[in-house]
Curated annotation (Swiss-Prot):
Region (Domain I): 1-63
GO cellular component terms listed in the entry, alphabetical order: cytoplasm; Holliday junction helicase complex; Holliday junction resolvase complex
Single GO MF descriptor: four-way junction DNA binding
Domain of life: Bacteria
Written domain comment of the UniProt record: Has three domains with a flexible linker between the domains II and III and assumes an 'L' shape. Domain III is highly mobile and contacts RuvB.
Protein name, per record: Holliday junction branch migration complex subunit RuvA
Location of this chain's protein in the cell: Cytoplasm
Region (Domain II) residue spans: 64-141
Keyword Electron transport: no
InterPro entries: DNA_helicase_Holl-junc_RuvA_I (IPR013849), Hlx-hairpin-Hlx_DNA-bd_motif (IPR003583), NA-bd_OB-fold (IPR012340), RuvA (IPR000085), RuvA_2-like (IPR010994), RuvA_C (IPR011114), RuvA_C_sf (IPR036267)
Annotated function: The RuvA-RuvB-RuvC complex processes Holliday junction (HJ) DNA during genetic recombination and DNA repair, while the RuvA-RuvB complex plays an important role in the rescue of blocked DNA replication forks via replication fork reversal (RFR). RuvA specifically binds to HJ cruciform DNA, conferring on it an open structure. The RuvB hexamer acts as an ATP-dependent pump, pulling dsDNA into and through the RuvAB complex. HJ branch migration allows RuvC to scan DNA until it finds its consensus sequence, where it cleaves and resolves the cruciform DNA.
GO biological process: DNA recombination; DNA repair
Amino acid sequence: MTVGLIGVVEKISALEVHIEVQGVVYGVQVSMRTASMLQTGQKARLKILQVIKEDAHLLYGFLEESEKILFERLLKINGVGGRIALAILSSFSPNEFENIIATKEVKRLQQVPGIGKKLADKIMVDLIGFFIQDETKPVHNEAFLALESLGFKSAEINPILKKLKPNLSVEEAIKEALQQLRS
């Protein structure tokens, strides 16, 4: 599995960059925000999410881990694919998007190409508990994704994550949360 690429940017378009890594050129799907921060001929380091579908093998690239985490979470929402998730990341930074969800600004979410009222409402409902407002956010968000992938619901996960000690590692947070979820 590819989790990162370091190489020279060969080509930049609105939603894709080509990166040459030791003689191999990779096509990587990126948000317009990410594409605007890269320069042709310059070295780039992207965090990669590899998605393998029946008809395609796709690489999605991110400059920041927070973008990658948000993208992965968006893909779990029924009706949101890579194109819409990239459109969201093209329109808002992860912090801006978090504020939109926290303040329930459905209308702003509907301004993203491909998102109508029904999908905006679904995204809002699915993500309302995902963002935790404190300094332990990265650890809690990663633990949330891991627990969700194990089949737990956000209504079960969030109350437990909020009670955990703030200085835990991701692994410790998952372990403690699992103990509480299974008891």
